[in-house]
């Protein structure tokens, strides 16, 4: 009998935990005369007791029971020799303990079962070729969402109100209401309908003029024409594009600990908005999202669609450890797989990364087939231009580049001559350099005592830093008195004042490197010079004899990329700030680096004539550079890099890239094998073809998931609740549809309409279900508390973006500029990691629609964040709606809303006249609430204005529920 060490024995004690069966069967009854039937007797036993903990994705004890070969490779089974098969040892009851090692958490196997396994091994352990055992998920291929679309006839019911018998949508809805003895609500008022429809399609309030015109229009098709107008309005794409950006987790920073801005991701946002406005077929959108670079190589409007795969968070630290780097790469592709599965198919495919899905029929093999599909996709930017544009640009640039190269060649010849002369005299120069070079961590200069009211540091030369973006830096600047108890009289707390221009890197905070940091007495924060001079004014004239300054006293930021190093300087003092006396300089210090050494030689040796010649060359080169800069670069967009990555591709055991299991190839998911024709590609197939085949499979006519998920999303965004209330999970852990026949009817309508969305949206909005009032009825709520069955229109609070856009719209400040780079509601500082600080002041550049905000991950934006705008580190297929004290405080006290209260008051005075208080009140109610004030409201508003002012009324109305809730 083969013996195993105790440690391995302990590992095996995790085997045989009870699972649901892959092959449903009763406990086998052995027949001692017939040969053991593996599929009927052994497979059910292993699946029922063992496979959960011992499968390719979860090899506890380094054992997988999925295939005969994997059991043999682990050393647990020797066909024909049960006495040498350790598998039998762990399931036998021990004479010492009276227990079997396995199964650990369940009852021991029966003697008949052990005898059956023993016979099977003795007979040679027959195992059908190609058979792999796997655990059974809670939902199988018969799950409702995996079935073909069923075209059910809309129910007919003569008891339904006449206006509910026309639309198929209403007939489906009414049938469910009747089942629960519920009745629909009456039709909403015209004011409620135009407000509901306008917000629903555009995310903006209707204007008072639009409300008045709609209420006045008594024609039968007035409401239909309203919907047609709103669907054609450019604001439609902005609002519905925002919904889709939530689903695809679009963000404009990379997330993780560095979280740096991605400044060129905005073309994807514009592409999404444009696609919705143009009513682009959704199947085409899916293909462009997954393979836009494949089908539209020379069409930027198509290529940009493939940003979908790389618009999520990713770790860009660039870990040098190969194990960690492989894990980061696996996490990056996991984001693509999860988003693809959830956005288009409503399947939580990511749950099968480490093992077969516990709830849905998604194999780990399916996950890694998708992994192979996306293996060639990496985050990054690339130039987007068609060949003609590239050629035209090359023709413009080439002669200028040739001219510049010749100028540089002539300039270099002069510089080389100067450098050669300088090297010949280097020994003589170096004799004069007797002191140690200046150091970043500190420079000390002493000199005979001198009286000073002002002290000035002047840069005379910098050590070259090819990555420098700004001037030199000063951490601390100290001026010490010449007495028995020296004091640093430069300190701000001792009355010192610092003067000097700051240098800012684009995106830094104002004051991030302020000159005052040189005398704050704190090591670390520094001034980055925007001018050669730093001047310190002392509180009173002092006798001084020592000055100390540093670029980086702590030594923690010596490789800082933003600043050069002050290598040459002079120090001067003055009593009046006009006449200056030099007290120290670096003229006799050694160079700080080899590049600085060459520069000093060069400066000492260059003649007046040579300097003049070089200046002339520099002037000509700058002119050529100016002309080159005037030629616009082809756009570089965040669309990802796509490279060929060939197989073999493996399942990662337990999700660990270091533990490679069975091989896989790019292929469709087996989840839909019964209803949709699948595909399987070679491991070395072109990487673009893999993504294109996946996209075509997702939108194939027999795939029931994609249209169902899409139809449900449309329903959710119109009613605030989906037919399936988990929009991105149509599996076992999601909810089942409240109206399954209606969902399939909508799905088929989408397909019949060539995947265009506006027509089905119009049908939804023309339904009586959509046009119901939102009045609460206690009896109905007891049966259907959240109105999923639609006995009324579910009221909702506006989203954070809608609230912000509404405030700007009613004040007349909304900037409707479409497209292009976004604006920021935060200040952005990048110094290896990024920091985002919400703005405290808001100018016209921030008054665009919120969809154009540069939506950085984890960047808190008070109003938007407080009103539940999601963190786009994750997809947000369904937004949460919370009610918190912070929301009321933000609307009442935030600088943005205070500004808009003033703007609104100014608009009311302009629209209604400065002296007509009652007209101002009426106009305010029309703008904010789309109605006239009631008499008691008019009186209360008049009293508030009299007691305070018009701004107070505006502030109060902005803080009302009626503004931010939609009936």
Identify the residue ranges that each predicted region occupies.
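Aromatic- and Gly/Pro-enriched helix-to-coil junctions and flexible linker segments
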Residues: 22-292, 357, 377-437, 442, ...
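Bacterial N-terminal signal peptides
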Residues: 10-21
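An acidic, gly/pro-interrupted, aromatic-rich
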Residues: 168, 172-177, 275-277, 285, ...
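Aromatic, loop-rich ligand-recognition surfaces of beta-strand-rich domains
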Residues: 431-623, 688-693
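Helix-loop-helix junctions that connect adjacent transmembrane helices in secondary transporters/permeases
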Residues: 936-948
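Conserved phosphate-binding loops in nucleotide/dinucleotide-binding enzymes
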Residues: 75-78, 873-880, 945
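Residues that flank catalytic or metal-binding motifs in active/ligand-binding sites
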Residues: 49, 59-61, 83, 140-142, ...
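N-terminal secretory signal peptides that target proteins for export/translocation
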Residues: 1-7
């Amino acid at each position: 009998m083969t013996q195993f060490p105790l440690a391995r024995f302990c590992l095996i004690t995790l085997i045989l935990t009870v699972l649901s069966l892959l092959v449903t069967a009763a406990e086998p009854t052995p027949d001692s005369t017939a040969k053991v039937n593996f599929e009927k007797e052994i497979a059910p036993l292993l699946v029922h007791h063992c496979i959960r903990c011992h499968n390719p994705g979860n090899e506890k004890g380094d054992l997988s029971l999925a295939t005969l070969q994997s059991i043999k490779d682990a050393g647990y089974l020797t066909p024909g020799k049960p006495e040498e098969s350790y598998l039998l040892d762990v399931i036998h009851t021990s004479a010492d303990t009276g227990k079997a090692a396995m199964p650990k958490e369940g009852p021991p196997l029966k003697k008949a079962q052990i005898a059956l396994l023993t016979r099977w091994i003795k007979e040679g352990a027959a195992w059908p070729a190609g058979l792999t055992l796997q655990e059974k998920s809670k939902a199988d291929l018969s799950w409702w969402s995996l079935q073909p679309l069923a075209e059910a006839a809309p129910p007919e019911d003569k008891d339904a109100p006449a206006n509910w018998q026309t639309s198929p949508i209403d007939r489906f809805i009414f049938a469910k209401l009747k089942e629960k003895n519920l009745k629909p609500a009456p039709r909403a008022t015209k004011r409620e309908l135009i407000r509901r429809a306008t917000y629903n399609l555009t995310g903006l309030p209707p204007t008072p003029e639009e409300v008045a015109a709609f209420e006045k229009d008594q024609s039968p098709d007035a409401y239909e024409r309203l919907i047609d107008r709103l669907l054609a309005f450019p604001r439609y794409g902005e609002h519905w594009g925002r919904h889709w950006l939530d689903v695809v987790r679009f963000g404009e920073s990379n997330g993780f600990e560095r979280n740096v801005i991605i400044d060129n991701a905005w073309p994807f946002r514009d592409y999404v908005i444009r696609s919705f406005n143009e009513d682009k077929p959704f199947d085409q959108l899916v293909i462009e999202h997954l393979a836009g670079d494949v089908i539209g190589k020379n069409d930027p409007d198509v290529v940009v669609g493939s940003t979908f795969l790389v618009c999520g968070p990713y770790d860009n630290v660039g870990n040098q450890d190969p194990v960690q780097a492989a894990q980061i790469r696996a996490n990056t592709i996991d984001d693509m797989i999860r988003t693809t599965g959830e956005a288009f198919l409503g399947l939580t495919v990511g749950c099968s990364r480490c093992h077969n899905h516990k709830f849905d029929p998604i194999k780990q093999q399916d996950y890694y087939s998708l992994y192979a599909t996306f293996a060639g996709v990496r985050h990054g930017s690339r130039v987007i231009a068609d060949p003609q544009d590239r050629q035209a640009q090359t023709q413009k640039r080439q002669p200028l580049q040739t001219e510049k190269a010749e100028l540089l060649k002539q300039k270099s010849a002069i510089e080389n001559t100067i450098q050669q002369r300088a090297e010949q005299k280097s020994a003589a120069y170096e004799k004069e350099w007797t002191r140690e070079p200046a150091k970043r961590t500190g420079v000390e200069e002493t000199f005979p005592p001198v009286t000073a009211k002002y002290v000035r540091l002047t840069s005379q030369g910098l050590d070259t830093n090819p990555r420098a973006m700004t001037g030199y830096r000063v951490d601390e600047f100290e001026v010490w008195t010449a007495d028995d108890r020296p004091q640093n009289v430069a300190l701000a707390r001792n009355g010192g004042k610092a003067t000097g221009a700051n240098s800012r890197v684009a995106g830094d905070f104002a004051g991030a490197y302020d000159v005052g940091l040189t005398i704050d007495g704190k090591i670390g924060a520094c001034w980055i010079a925007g001018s050669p001079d730093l001047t310190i004014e002392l509180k009173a004239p002092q006798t001084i004899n020592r000055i100390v300054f540093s670029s980086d006293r702590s030594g923690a930021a010596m490789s800082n990329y933003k600043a050069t190093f002050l290598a040459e300087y002079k120090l001067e003092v003055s009593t009046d700030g006009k006449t200056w006396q030099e007290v120290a300089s670096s003229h006799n210090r050694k160079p700080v680096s080899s590049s600085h050494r060459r520069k000093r030689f060069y400066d000492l040796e260059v003649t007046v004539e040579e300097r003049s010649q070089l200046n002339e060359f520099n002037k000509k080169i700058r002119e050529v550079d100016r002309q080159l800069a005037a030629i616009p670069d082809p756009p570089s967009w965040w669309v990802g890099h796509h490279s060929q990555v060939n197989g073999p591709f493996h399942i990662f055991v337990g999700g660990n890239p270091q533990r490679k299991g069975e091989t896989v190839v790019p292929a469709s998911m087996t989840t839909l094998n019964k209803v949709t024709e699948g595909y399987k590609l070679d491991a070395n197939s072109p990487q673009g073809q893999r993504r294109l085949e996946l996209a075509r499979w997702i939108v194939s006519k027999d795939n029931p998931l994609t249209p169902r998920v899409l139809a449900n999303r449309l329903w959710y965004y119109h009613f605030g609740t989906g037919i399936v209330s988990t929009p991105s999970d149509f599996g076992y852990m999601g909810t089942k549809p409240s109206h399954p026949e209606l969902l399939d009817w909508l799905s088929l309508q989408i397909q019949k309409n060539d995947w265009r969305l506006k027509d089905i949206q119009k049908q939804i909005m023309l339904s009586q279900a959509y046009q119901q009032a939102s009045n609460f009825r206690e009896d109905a709520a007891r049966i259907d508390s959240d109105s999923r069955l639609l006995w009324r229109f579910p009221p909702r609070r506006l989203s954070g973006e809608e609230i912000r856009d509404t405030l700007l719209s009613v004040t007349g400040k909304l900037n409707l500029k479409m497209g292009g780079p976004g604006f920021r509601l935060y200040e952005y500082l990048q110094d290896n990691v990024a920091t985002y600080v919400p703005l405290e002041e808001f100018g016209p550049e921030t008054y665009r629609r919120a969809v154009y905000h540069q939506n950085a991950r984890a960047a808190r934006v008070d109003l938007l964040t407080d009103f539940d705008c999601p963190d786009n580190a994750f997809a947000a297929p369904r937004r949460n709606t919370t009610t918190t004290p912070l929301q009321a405080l933000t609307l009442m006290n935030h600088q943005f809303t205070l500004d808009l209260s003033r703007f609104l008051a100014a608009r009311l005075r302009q629209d209604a006249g400065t002296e007509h208080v009652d007209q101002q009140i009426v106009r305010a109610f029309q703008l904010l609430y789309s109605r006239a004030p009631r008499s008691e409201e008019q009186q209360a508003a008049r009293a508030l204005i009299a007691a305070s002012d018009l701004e107070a009324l505006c502030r109060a109305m902005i803080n009302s529920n009626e503004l931010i809730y939609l009936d």
